Amino acid sequence: MARIIETSTGLDALTFDDVLLQPGHSEVMPGQTNIATRIAQDIELNVPILSAAMDTVTESRLAIAMAQAGGMGVIHRNLTPVQQAEEVRQVKKFESGMVVNPVTIGPDATLAEALSLDEGPRHFRASPVVEKSHRLVGILTNRDVRFASDPEQKIYELMTRENLVTVKDGVQQHEAKRLLHTHRIEKXLVVDADSRFVGLITVKDIEKSQLNPHASKDAQGRLRAAAAISVGDDGYERAERLIDAGVDLLVVDTAHGHSQRVLDAVTRVKKLSNSVRIMAGNVATYDGTRALIDAGADAVKVGIGPGSICTTRIVAGVGVPQLAAIMSAVQAAQDQNIPIIADGGIKFSGDLAKAIAAGASAAMIGSLLAGTDESPGEVYLYQGRSFKAYRGMGSVGAMARGSADRYFQAEVRDTLKLVPEGIEGXVPYKGPVSGVLHQLAGGLKAAMGYVGGADLKDFQERATFVRISGAGLRESHAHDVTITPRKARIIPAQAADR
């Protein structure tokens, strides 16, 4: 017979709306706080936010914007393995400290072969000329091929080989920038100590990195990217392709992470690579968290049914209110220092602050990011307002497209026989994702200022919750007033001082 058990928040399992953070003595201003976090062994983010692996939230465009802002995007798996791997490649090559493994050509190749790399002589840009031993012998530029007419002419007869501007592998960005400026070129060739070609440093990538100083990047200066996989052979094969594409974090993404199939998948995928980290979920209990950690997970994703478009708790009657789930997972993971990711239920920046205060290293967010410019889908008008589509991965539409195995219904071929655990809907259009992330991060920093935490660890140690009533929740929101929109205006410094 079922029994009522006690959770980390007592007999009453609590969620974000049940509590508030208590203010305390503070010597910290919000602008002085540090919200950097670690979401896996060697993956740090400057903003503790990941975008959800949902087909109306995260593809390469949003993942790029997330990484540039200091967060991370998890590319959904309602794509073929080839398509998903290509989405990861788009992120990894968008902003590189160094372009690794660029297209090269051998000195014995022909002009025709070189032009086939691009769209003919008018569009040909440049290609390093590299021997089979990887030794750099020249560069073939647009000037070299512009007036060449013999398609069988060898590259070594056309290429530029004198006065090549090269830099050593590991060169500092400021030194590379100085060389590019001195020689008035847009690409510098990177070689190792034995003059073997390693990669390219470009002006565009240097400019991008200066525009986004807090971007999440790997050791090679490329934007960070994560991708979701399933369990079984499909998940394993997908993981192999994603690793080849350069993914930083694989997310074993299921509705019930405390399942033997998921535990086996984590253990199996973990053996594929020593450099790629594994996040697994979703769970909502102490035991579920421990099981995933024992299976080899580098981070654990927490949340059964808290999302705005998730109906698992209604359809199956299963779940744990999110705050209690986070605290239970943190308790299970703290002795091994495994990060906990709070997935779902974030409606306001204050909810993000509460999730972090409860011990989460970061939060995964879907609905707040779904209506942005960078999310998949088109903006449409409804009753005079702009919206974008948003649906749960447990909705009929998403399950029919490929996510049925997330809910262990992969064998169901007739969509009428699917048992959905999510809905399809729309969210208001929000503009660029950078604005949404700014508000979320700003709310978190404000909470840290109220509590007195200079960084996330300090914030978590100082934070205390107070339970509130329904009346307290109503009092917390704007009330007894009609909210009117007003355009922002800049207040002169003298007026602000008064």
UniProtKB/Swiss-Prot annotation:
<dbReference type="InterPro" id="IPR005990">
    <property type="entry name" value="IMP_DH"/>
</dbReference>
<dbReference type="GO" id="GO:0003938">
    <property type="term" value="F:IMP dehydrogenase activity"/>
</dbReference>
<protein>
    <recommendedName>
        <fullName>Inosine-5'-monophosphate dehydrogenase</fullName>
        <ecNumber>1.1.1.205</ecNumber>
    </recommendedName>
</protein>
<feature type="binding site">
    <location>
        <position position="475"/>
    </location>
    <ligand>
        <name>K(+)</name>
    </ligand>
</feature>
<keyword id="KW-0479">Metal-binding</keyword>
<feature type="binding site" description="in other chain">
    <location>
        <position position="305"/>
    </location>
    <ligand>
        <name>K(+)</name>
    </ligand>
</feature>
<comment type="function">
    <text>Catalyzes the conversion of inosine 5'-phosphate (IMP) to xanthosine 5'-phosphate (XMP), the first committed and rate-limiting step in the de novo synthesis of guanine nucleotides, and therefore plays an important role in the regulation of cell growth.</text>
</comment>
<keyword id="KW-0129">CBS domain</keyword>
<dbReference type="GO" id="GO:0000166">
    <property type="term" value="F:nucleotide binding"/>
</dbReference>
<comment type="subunit">
    <text>Homotetramer.</text>
</comment>
<keyword id="KW-0560">Oxidoreductase</keyword>
<dbReference type="GO" id="GO:0006177">
    <property type="term" value="P:GMP biosynthetic process"/>
</dbReference>
<dbReference type="GO" id="GO:0046872">
    <property type="term" value="F:metal ion binding"/>
</dbReference>
<feature type="binding site">
    <location>
        <begin position="343"/>
        <end position="345"/>
    </location>
    <ligand>
        <name>IMP</name>
    </ligand>
</feature>
<feature type="binding site">
    <location>
        <position position="253"/>
    </location>
    <ligand>
        <name>NAD(+)</name>
    </ligand>
</feature>
<dbReference type="GO" id="GO:0006183">
    <property type="term" value="P:GTP biosynthetic process"/>
</dbReference>
<comment type="pathway">
    <text>Purine metabolism; XMP biosynthesis via de novo pathway; XMP from IMP: step 1/1.</text>
</comment>
<feature type="domain" description="CBS 1">
    <location>
        <begin position="98"/>
        <end position="155"/>
    </location>
</feature>
<feature type="binding site">
    <location>
        <position position="476"/>
    </location>
    <ligand>
        <name>K(+)</name>
    </ligand>
</feature>
<feature type="binding site">
    <location>
        <position position="477"/>
    </location>
    <ligand>
        <name>K(+)</name>
    </ligand>
</feature>
<dbReference type="InterPro" id="IPR046342">
    <property type="entry name" value="CBS_dom_sf"/>
</dbReference>
<feature type="binding site">
    <location>
        <begin position="390"/>
        <end position="394"/>
    </location>
    <ligand>
        <name>IMP</name>
    </ligand>
</feature>
<feature type="binding site">
    <location>
        <begin position="303"/>
        <end position="305"/>
    </location>
    <ligand>
        <name>NAD(+)</name>
    </ligand>
</feature>
<dbReference type="Pfam" id="PF00571">
    <property type="entry name" value="CBS"/>
</dbReference>
<keyword id="KW-0332">GMP biosynthesis</keyword>
<dbReference type="InterPro" id="IPR013785">
    <property type="entry name" value="Aldolase_TIM"/>
</dbReference>
<dbReference type="Pfam" id="PF00478">
    <property type="entry name" value="IMPDH"/>
</dbReference>
<dbReference type="InterPro" id="IPR001093">
    <property type="entry name" value="IMP_DH_GMPRt"/>
</dbReference>
<comment type="similarity">
    <text>Belongs to the IMPDH/GMPR family.</text>
</comment>
<feature type="binding site">
    <location>
        <position position="308"/>
    </location>
    <ligand>
        <name>IMP</name>
    </ligand>
</feature>
<keyword id="KW-0520">NAD</keyword>
<feature type="active site" description="Proton acceptor">
    <location>
        <position position="406"/>
    </location>
</feature>
<feature type="binding site" description="in other chain">
    <location>
        <position position="310"/>
    </location>
    <ligand>
        <name>K(+)</name>
    </ligand>
</feature>
<keyword id="KW-0677">Repeat</keyword>
<dbReference type="InterPro" id="IPR000644">
    <property type="entry name" value="CBS_dom"/>
</dbReference>
<keyword id="KW-0630">Potassium</keyword>
<feature type="binding site" description="in other chain">
    <location>
        <position position="307"/>
    </location>
    <ligand>
        <name>K(+)</name>
    </ligand>
</feature>
<feature type="binding site">
    <location>
        <begin position="366"/>
        <end position="367"/>
    </location>
    <ligand>
        <name>IMP</name>
    </ligand>
</feature>
<keyword id="KW-0658">Purine biosynthesis</keyword>
<feature type="active site" description="Thioimidate intermediate">
    <location>
        <position position="310"/>
    </location>
</feature>
<dbReference type="InterPro" id="IPR015875">
    <property type="entry name" value="IMP_DH/GMP_Rdtase_CS"/>
</dbReference>
<feature type="binding site">
    <location>
        <position position="421"/>
    </location>
    <ligand>
        <name>IMP</name>
    </ligand>
</feature>
